[in-house]
Amino acid sequence: MKGLRLPESMREELAKPHGKLYRGKGEKLLLEVEEISEAKPFCTVGDLVTASAIKVGLTPDLAVADGKTLREENVEFEQEAFDEVIETTNPPAHISCELISALLKALKLCEDGKKVLVFVDGEEDLAVVPLVKLLPLGALILYGQPGEGVVALKVDEEKKVLILNLLNKMEIIGECDELKYLLGGD
């Protein structure tokens, strides 16, 4: 598997919320996230956040999910809410070249007005990292903060610089064109 591996030393830094934390539980919490209305595109990472968004009528332009929450229980949501489903693989604590490729394909489809689900065999948690780098300024990523609520991460120049610094600290476990693009291209 080619891509990036998260070193143990970075796990604590990436576990912190990197956006505005909305505390609470349940679908109604998403209705409090005022950033959704102005975000283009609006993205979710994680099954519970994606399922909750769909339930309250806020189907994301791009969702990344793996069918599980906290790596255990299955979470079901309406895949029919999406125009396209792209399947990919990504091991825990990695950003695989396959995941980067799937995200790039999904973003092209989103540009054409399609709603896209990237379904990951493995783990989707770290998808937030490449998404910040790949999404345009003004995009919004919602992801779960275990035991606390939902994080609304608005993509801006500051976040892009932060993420590029984090990406460059990760361990390269095999190069691919998508990885070169992620680390250096814009």
From Swiss-Prot:
UniProt-listed InterPro entries: GTP-dep_dephospho-CoA_kin (IPR007164)
UniProt GO MF annotations: GTP binding; kinase activity
Keyword Coiled coil in annotation: no
Single Gene Ontology BP annotation: coenzyme A biosynthetic process
Catalysed reaction equations from the record: 3'-dephospho-CoA + GTP = GDP + CoA + H(+)
EC number in record: 2.7.1.237
Pathway terms, separated by semicolons: Cofactor biosynthesis; coenzyme A biosynthesis
Keyword Lyase found: no
EC top class, as a word: transferase
Chain sites annotated for binding GTP: D47, L48, V49, D66, K68, E124
Keyword terms of this UniProt record: Coenzyme A biosynthesis, GTP-binding, Kinase, Nucleotide-binding, Transferase
Biological role stated in the UniProt entry: Catalyzes the GTP-dependent phosphorylation of the 3'-hydroxyl group of dephosphocoenzyme A to form coenzyme A (CoA).
Family: Belongs to the GTP-dependent DPCK family.
HAMAP family referenced in this protein's UniProt entry, alphabetically: Dephospho_CoA_kinase_GTP_dep
Record-given protein name: GTP-dependent dephospho-CoA kinase
